[in-house]
Amino acid sequence: MVAVRRRRTQASNPRSEPPQHMSDHDSDSDWDTVCEECSSGKQPAKLLLCDKCDKGFHLFCLRPILVSVPKGSWFCPSCSKHQIPKSFPLIQTKIIDFFRIKRSPDSSQISSSSDSIGKKRKKTSLVMSKKKRRLLPYNPSNDPQRRLEQMASLATALRASNTKFSNELTYVSGKAPRSANQAAFEKGGMQVLSKEGVETLALCKKMMDLGECPPLMVVFDPYEGFTVEADRFIKDWTIITEYVGDVDYLSNREDDYDGDSMMTLLHASDPSQCLVICPDRRSNIARFISGINNHSPEGRKKQNLKCVRFNINGEARVLLVANRDISKGERLYYDYNGYEHEYPTEHFV
């Protein structure tokens, strides 16, 4: 469909024409639009047209569910050749190149740094620890082969999403410059990450640079799409990852219907200064962590991570942190609507 630009919604029903006496409203809801999955013409604004067969599907009837109309061409499951994503090759050199892993002459230094942070905390009294909890670095899996499998699972998801790996916020020409990211602009202020917290985050970054990734597996679910599961026990208050991607002004993305993974970075009093993180081109594992259903008690019970924005050296950063102990094999979830409450989650599992 290239002759007329439209949002590929309101799929026509070729099986019948509406009677002349019907109103335009009845025509739109009962005749002009239909979902091939539920056979309903309701909510025509959420019906997506296949660019090949022109059949309609509700965004929430698709598997996995779509939360917004995608950019460019879209093909229904019958017309699409997309099946289970092809796994990234479990070859060390390819994984090292994909993640740009730095070779370290002595990786034991990283482990000792993590242990020293833990020893410092043990000296703190129980009373003090209750008053001021501290962030923990994640503990990588001990088995190097298992870490390769974990990274290969992430590479599979990134490649299927046509996304390059990045573990930092990126500032590119034509979008928001780094100078725009000033935590001081945050409406109501932003909490400052402590010196020890900054050191803990830096340790997590260093471990990832050396291939000691978080103990997580990216798993493709036919209902939810790519999901993330804990591959070992994770303690409460452990840093899971930083939410990264291209930084842009919110005003540039207000009409981005495909920006379902955008994250608030800066919620400024001046709307022109509001920033978002866009992981559609560059991202890490944060992009694939699932959101809870805010509309059901069962959905809220699944939450095991929280999204927290910190002032780090004057800049806004977003961290995903465990908000309780997480068992091995447990799927990771956090609240997509922690700030603006604008993300549609009513059809989430």
Swiss-Prot record:
A zinc finger (PHD-type) spans 32-82. Transmembrane segments: none annotated. GO terms for molecular function: histone H3K27 methyltransferase activity; histone H3K27 monomethyltransferase activity; zinc ion binding. Changing residue 99 to A: Loss of methylation activity. Disruption phenotype: No visible phenotype. Atxr5 and atxr6 double mutant is smaller than wild-type plants, shows partial decondensation of the chromocenter, decreased H3K27 monomethylation and increased DNA re-replication. Residues 214-337 form the SET domain. S-adenosyl-L-methionine binds at residues 224-226, 287-291, 343, 349. Changing residue 309 to Q: Loss of methylation activity. A motif (PIP motif) lies at residues 92-99. InterPro entries: ATXR5/ATXR6 (IPR053114), SET_dom (IPR001214), SET_dom_sf (IPR046341), Zinc_finger_PHD-type_CS (IPR019786), Znf_FYVE_PHD (IPR011011), Znf_PHD (IPR001965), Znf_PHD-finger (IPR019787), Znf_RING/FYVE/PHD (IPR013083). GO terms for cellular component: nucleus. Changing residue 339 to A: 98% methylation activity on histone H3.1 and 22% methylation activity on histone H3.3. Changing residue 186 to D: 24% methylation activity on histone H3.1 and loss of methylation activity on histone H3.3. GO terms for biological process: anther dehiscence; methylation; regulation of cell cycle; regulation of DNA replication. Its EC number is 2.1.1.369. It is found in: Nucleus. Its main location: nucleus. Substrate binds at residues 190, 309, 339-340. Residues 1-28, 105-126 are annotated as: Disordered. It catalyses: L-lysyl(27)-[histone H3] + S-adenosyl-L-methionine = N(6)-methyl-L-lysyl(27)-[histone H3] + S-adenosyl-L-homocysteine + H(+). It holds the Pfam family SET. The keyword Secreted does not apply. Keywords: Chromatin regulator, Metal-binding, Methyltransferase, Nucleus, S-adenosyl-L-methionine, Transferase, Zinc, Zinc-finger. Belongs to the class V-like SAM-binding methyltransferase superfamily. Histone-lysine methyltransferase family. TRX/MLL subfamily. Histone methyltransferase that specifically monomethylates 'Lys-27' of histone H3 (H3K27me1). Has higher activity on nucleosomes containing H3.1 than H3.3. Involved in the formation of constitutive heterochromatin and the silencing of heterochromatic elements. May act as a positive regulator of the G1-S transition. Influences which sets of rRNA gene variants are expressed or silenced. Up-regulated by E2FB. This is Histone-lysine N-methyltransferase ATXR6. It comes from Arabidopsis thaliana.
